């Protein structure tokens, strides 16, 4: 009887652990291209990722020099939404700016 209670307790503890586990996180990465103006990249970082002028400029320079820069870390749905928003905003203004998401 004791082993039945122990296994039930383990099952309950396992379910509680599964419910409280944090969701997987994804980083949104902005990719460099040869056509999008630096000022536009700064504007995107401010508008869609809430960066101030200094942070946005730092990330933009990282993208420019290293080819990529991390805009933020979000749950999957939020990351996907930000990527779609940036793509739509950039395309509407005829810029080829791209973002991707990567698991953290």
Curated annotation (Swiss-Prot):
User: Alphabetically, which GO biological process terms does the record hold?
Assistant: protein catabolic process; proteolysis
| SUPFAM superfamilies documented for this protein | ClpS-like (SSF54736)
Domain of life, per the record? Bacteria
Q: Which InterPro entries does its entry note?
A: ClpS (IPR022935), ClpS_core (IPR003769), Ribosomal_bL12_C/ClpS-like (IPR014719)
Coiled-coil portions:
none
Record-stated family: Belongs to the ClpS family.
What quaternary arrangement does the UniProt entry report?
Answer: Binds to the N-terminal domain of the chaperone ClpA.
What does the UniProt function comment say about this protein? Involved in the modulation of the specificity of the ClpAP-mediated ATP-dependent protein degradation.
User: Protein name, please?
Assistant: ATP-dependent Clp protease adapter protein ClpS
Species, as recorded: Bordetella avium (strain 197N)
State the taxonomy lineage.
Bacteria, Pseudomonadati, Pseudomonadota, Betaproteobacteria, Burkholderiales
Q: Which gene encodes it?
A: clpS
